Amino acid sequence: MKTRLLLACAILMTACAQAPSNEIVAEGETPVKVADSYSFTEGPAVDARGDVYFTDQPNNSIYRWDCESGEITLFTDQSGRSNGMYFDAQGNLIACADMDNQLWSFDMKGQHEILVTDYREKLLNGPNDVWIAKDGSYYLTDPYFKRDYWTRDTARQQPVEGLYYLAPGGNQLVMLDSTLNQPNGIVGTPDGKYLYVAEAKANRILRYDIQTDGSLTNRQVFADMGSDGMTIDDRGNIYLTGDGVTVFDKEGHKIAHFPIPEDWTANVCFGGKERNILFITASKSVYTLKMLVHGL
């Protein structure tokens, strides 16, 4: 009797562990490759319409995926080798211009202006990813990942790999955390309470409390797993990348994993008119996955 009870409990626990995956993905849906003609895709960002912009970083290009037609068109071939991107409230595409050590803002004609060039009069290492809070605050990671396609000075520019804050309308970065080992993907909660940061070399995800002045407190390890880019859904689930896409609930429990048949899955965001299409950048390709949950 005891053995049967233990077996029943084990089966129930397994079912419960698997159930959340079925609760976030639309029935019968699996990742679908929509294009595969790139060198290395990165930085997906969704605009107000639901279209997704993404980079082909080695080829210095940004592309736009039309959420209605599925068509992909070139947005610009002068991207500053942009990595992570995010749309601001005014509809500008904010991009981490990795090769130029800068943060850029693109209008919808593909013209850019420079938002940030340095910290304390020294160039940044190479901005990697950015998240914008609802109040217009920017949070930016600046690790040092030397690229073989850089044509600029490839030396490390900053003594640390920093996590930075940029106040709304400001142009001077504020250091938030100088102790990180290759900070990478970054995303915050829509209520502005928490910030998640991937620490690549430490192979973990950190969570901070965001204060009213934009500063961070109460740093904690959220998950013992690294990530490249990240995103969040309307239930507070966090989507990590690298070996496919792995999903953690807001309590830090792993609830799903979506294998992607590529060497590396670099980044992810929610697109589509209803923000229910998970858009995945993975090596030379991009994929979509229809979800039950929605992006923010």
Residue ranges and their predicted role:
Residues 2-8:
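Sec-dependent signal peptide recognition
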Residues 16-296:
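Sequence-structural signature of mature extracellular/luminal beta-sheet repeat domains
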